[in-house]
Amino acid sequence: MEWKLNLLLYLALFFFLLFLLFLLLFVVIKQLKNSVANTAGTLQPGRLSLHREPWGFNNEQAV
């Protein structure tokens, strides 16, 4: 009887960890899609880019 309880516990733990893994994978894929969509949106040629250099210089000031 006790081995059935252990088996049930291990199966429940296994499926719970599998669920957490798929949830994490889903969140990571969603973030990657969002990141790729954001970078593709800023690289469109018809749209003005609001990209700033990290040190605060504009292209006109650097010349």
From Swiss-Prot:
Keyword Membrane: yes
GO cellular component: plasma membrane
Residue ranges of the TM segments: 9-29
Keywords per UniProt: Cell membrane, Membrane, Transmembrane, Transmembrane helix
Membrane topology category: Single-pass membrane protein
Major site of localization recorded for this protein: membrane
GO molecular function terms noted in the UniProt entry: transmembrane transporter binding
Tissue specificity field: Accumulates in the posterior primitive streak of mid-gastrulation embryos at 7.0 dpc. In the adult, highly abundant and enriched in the brain compared to other organs.
Classification via InterPro entries: SMIM43
Coiled-coil spans in chain: none
Subcellular location: Cell membrane
GO annotation (BP), single: positive regulation of D-glucose transmembrane transport
Key word Cell membrane present: yes
Region (Important for interaction with SLC2A1 and SLC2A3): 7-29, 51-57
Pfam families: SMIM43
General function of this protein: Required for mesendoderm differentiation. Interacts with glucose transporters and promotes glucose uptake. Probably augments the glucose uptake capacity of glucose transporter proteins to meet the energy needs of mesendoderm differentiation.
Subunit-level organization: Interacts with glucose transporters SLC2A1/GLUT1 and SLC2A3/GLUT3; the interactions may promote SLC2A1- and SLC2A3-mediated glucose transport to meet the energy needs of mesendoderm differentiation.
Name of the protein: Small integral membrane protein 43
